[in-house]
UniProtKB/Swiss-Prot annotation:
GO terms for molecular function: quercetin 3-O-glucosyltransferase activity; quercetin 7-O-glucosyltransferase activity; steviolbioside glucosyltransferase activity (rebaudioside B forming); stevioside glucosyltransferase activity (rebaudioside A forming); UDP-glucosyltransferase activity. Changing residue 379 to I: Reduces catalytic efficiency 2.5-fold for stevioside. The gene is UGT76G1. Optimum pH is 7.0-8.5 with stevioside as substrate (at 40 degrees Celsius). Overexpression of UGT76G1 in Stevia leaves increases the rebaudioside A/stevioside ratio more than 5-fold without compromising plant development or changes in total steviol glycoside content. Rebaudioside A has the advantage to be sweeter and have less bitter aftertaste than stevioside. Changing residue 207 to W: Reduces catalytic efficiency 13-fold for stevioside. This is UDP-glycosyltransferase 76G1. Optimum temperature is 40 degrees Celsius with stevioside as substrate (at pH 7.0). CDD domains: GT1_Gtf-like (cd03784). Its EC number is 2.4.1.-. The keyword Disulfide bond does not apply.
Amino acid sequence: MENKTETTVRRRRRIILFPVPFQGHINPILQLANVLYSKGFSITIFHTNFNKPKTSNYPHFTFRFILDNDPQDERISNLPTHGPLAGMRIPIINEHGADELRRELELLMLASEEDEEVSCLITDALWYFAQSVADSLNLRRLVLMTSSLFNFHAHVSLPQFDELGYLDPDDKTRLEEQASGFPMLKVKDIKSAYSNWQILKEILGKMIKQTKASSGVIWNSFKELEESELETVIREIPAPSFLIPLPKHLTASSSSLLDHDRTVFQWLDQQPPSSVLYVSFGSTSEVDEKDFLEIARGLVDSKQSFLWVVRPGFVKGSTWVEPLPDGFLGERGRIVKWVPQQEVLAHGAIGAFWTHSGWNSTLESVCEGVPMIFSDFGLDQPLNARYMSDVLKVGVYLENGWERGEIANAIRRVMVDEEGEYIRQNARVLKQKADVSLMKGGSSYESLESLVSYISSL
């Protein structure tokens, strides 16, 4: 039983968490906040008004909305809310947000009760400007890395990739070659991940530098999943690292920016075990109508039941699923706008997950033992897809785009074909490793205990 005096002492420590305001970044930091709250810490969330979560889902947290309160600030107010340009908030706030963040932190630190102390600031790694602000206030900053250790390894290898010519967008001659130092990657994976190299160069350089300057890094992962990458992280980052698979602690449904369709569970309850393909390509991806129809035909040709999440705005130029022909679904499929993904993946009817290969989705599937079909839309996604399909062998990577025959074959291979049994078995084994890591003495259990002790000592 937990020592009550120890809990009281911990309650006097407050942690401030500051996520990047996009779904794939909000989910893990709010999961982390809940985990830390359960360990006795008081929680304050700094957040922009843009994409702010439903505070009513978190009555145990204090929220402060910062950095985009001024409608006269055209640098922020004129940015779109969807699409690639929405992400310009990140470099703009990094460049201009330091003074306001410092004021907000000072106010909170001064307002702390006599028996409560602000222990640290935990920010998304992409808020690299927060390091100098925290340093100026003698406040420790920890970083939550929302991508994989393998992805970080690729980031720190970018100078090498640049020198080898892998980042040259005009060089198409070596796309299928193995990357030097990364035999599991093809040159085309690197080109896809860093296609906006000139824009990413400064952002990633500063992110890496300030992550190395932080007081600690929390990884949404677990040792048994990425043990081969730990050596690189330990070599590159002097501060301690903590590997905690956040989906194994809490679902992310309460942090969703979109409304869930929960009627899907009635339909899933009527399906045989492991018979349904769950399809979702994340909260920001977009496809052309031609590709959308190719996805649809591949699903039908696979002859497997499917639950397909088509977010409004997913199909360019369409409101929702208007391009689909009448009668497309038949009796095998169901299309919805959004679902509580972790709960769906945990349902016994789900046999595979066709994903955009974002790290949150990938890790959620691993934690539920669900094999995957991987597509990607750039950024870290091709790296995740390659690592999971070719190194861990828990899925099939559709690396050549959208073609109905390849789609149907991949679905059947992962879900029902005998040749895909090793994929299904590998997925089950990884889930078991994740479960064991959370038991007392396991790597994730010990990592969380170490994190709590570390923050308490700051």
